[in-house]
Amino acid sequence: MNPLRQLLKSAGSHAPLGTWIMAASPLVTEAMGHAGFQWCVIDMEHTPLDMMEVIHLLQAAGNTKMVPIVRVPWNDTVSIKRVLDAGAQTLLIPFVQNADEAQRAVAATRYPPEGIRGLAGMSRGSKFGTVPDYARTANKTVGAVLQLETPAAVAQLEAIAAVPGVDSLFLGPGDLSAALGHAGNTGHPDVMRVMADAARRCNAVGMPVGTVGGTPEVVVQYRAMGFNYVAIGSDLGLLMRGAQAAVKALTTPDGETHVHTLSGGTQTSSGAY
């Protein structure tokens, strides 16, 4: 079974928590898994990650229980084929607008006769040719998650969900906010209404649906709407928030570092211990 499908099945009514991976650091990815995140999205759309970096991040996630999903740069056959050959088992395919584009996305993830994925005998995806009957079994273990990011796409939700081979839908609140005229304001009532409506409709047709929120409070809201799995921020976002909080807590309004007493002496940012 596909790892994401298995995770969602075992989670029941509890929405698994994930995060976004944007840093090209296997150590950070592995740390996120050990921190307790149950799934992650390795993002090739909005980062400069190359294929070898993606492989290293997949290997790092593989050292944990965290299920990796790779977001490809675009809904095109070549990108999808290369990422699958690199060993990804679940793909997030961005900006799917209708059933035709959904069919094209799914076809790119499947070998003939179910799809058009090109066959390579020696790839990381097939464990370098050691997986028995990989060309036949891969179609059952690959997962396709399609991202809806505009009101036009959400209007086609049921038609997209009905395409055979679609494992899950994923709402992109950032691009959705821009498409609704509220760029960057994902908490705007117009955006939240569309998000809630999309979650309700996915639940009605039995289609798992995920999304991403920037704060714990937003994640709780999305879970209450009916989203089956939700990510919070990203590795870089979590790093920046922690770093900024530390700097704010230890810096005076005039920009000087607070003075601390250490072993009977004082220490400032300009001195040495």
Model regions: which residues?
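N-terminal amphipathic alpha-helix/helix-capping segment at the start of soluble metabolic enzymes
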Residues: 1-22, 128-140, 196-198, 203-204, ...
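Active-site-adjacent beta->alpha loops and helix N-cap segments on the catalytic face
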Residues: 1-6, 46-66, 74-81, 96-134, ...
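Conserved N-terminal beta1-alpha1 strand-loop-helix module at the mouth
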Residues: 1-75, 107, 144, 162-167
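Conserved beta-strand positions in the central sheet of alpha/beta enzyme cores
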Residues: 40-41, 69, 92, 170, ...
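Conserved anion-binding
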Residues: 78, 88-164, 175-178, 254, ...
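Glycine-rich beta-to-alpha transition loops that act as phosphate-gripper elements at the mouths
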Residues: 20-24, 70-77, 94-96, 147-152, ...
